């Protein structure tokens, strides 16, 4: 599925992605310059940093967009495997805590035509892959956006991959109920690479 087909069904989401992530892959009208802008780099290897085994710690806001400040915590593992030479990857997560266990699968697919990633997530509770998060990386930071419904109201969803090193990275999920003006983080995960022989 191309990004444009997805966004045709959701023009509001397209506008948000363009506004919040300038690398969204659609040219904007700009004043004429003496030289043409450099083409966007191929992002096929944006997730290469994540291949392998990880330990993870997750903080999850129990009731997002309700004013709640009650968080629950989980610890566990994540494994990410390369598919199609890096044009796709599969991530598995298995974490547990006082609030229970979360088992999830992340499928990430790269579209070379738009130079964007499509991230789909399913948990073992219902197996639904859901609508994709769409975006890419710029200067070591990944931003991905989606539009969903939460408790009967339309919201925007944002993933941010940050603090990427050879041994660690962070992932934050946030929701916005006001069209992207403000964001409330509700899933904060830190990852540490499992060292060989450890």
Language model region names:
Residues 1-7:
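N-terminal secretory signal peptides that target proteins for export/translocation
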Residues 10-21:
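Bacterial N-terminal signal peptides
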Residues 28-198:
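Hydrophobic small-molecule pocket/channel-lining residues, especially in calycin-type beta-barrels
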């Amino acid at each position: 599925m191309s990004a444009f087909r997805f966004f045709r069904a959701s023009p509001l989401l397209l506008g948000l992605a363009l506004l919040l992530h300038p690398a969204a892959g659609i040219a904007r009208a700009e004043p004429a310059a003496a030289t043409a802008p450099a083409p966007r780099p191929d992002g096929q290897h944006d997730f290469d940093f994540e291949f392998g085994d990880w330990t993870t710690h997750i903080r999850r806001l129990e009731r997002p967009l309700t004013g709640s400040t009650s968080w629950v915590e989980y610890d566990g593992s994540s494994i990410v495997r390369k598919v199609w030479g890096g044009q796709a990857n599969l991530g598995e997560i298995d974490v547990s805590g006082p609030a229970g266990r979360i088992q999830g699968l992340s499928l990430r697919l790269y579209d070379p035509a738009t130079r964007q990633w499509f991230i789909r997530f399913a948990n073992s509770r219902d197996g639904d892959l859901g609508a994709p998060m769409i975006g890419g990386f710029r200067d070591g930071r990944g931003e991905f956006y989606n539009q969903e419904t939460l408790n009967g109201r339309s919201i925007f969803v944002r993933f941010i991959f940050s603090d990427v090193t050879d041994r660690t990275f962070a992932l934050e999920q946030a929701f916005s109920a006001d069209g992207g003006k403000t964001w409330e983080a509700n899933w904060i995960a830190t990852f540490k690479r499992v060292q060989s022989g450890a």
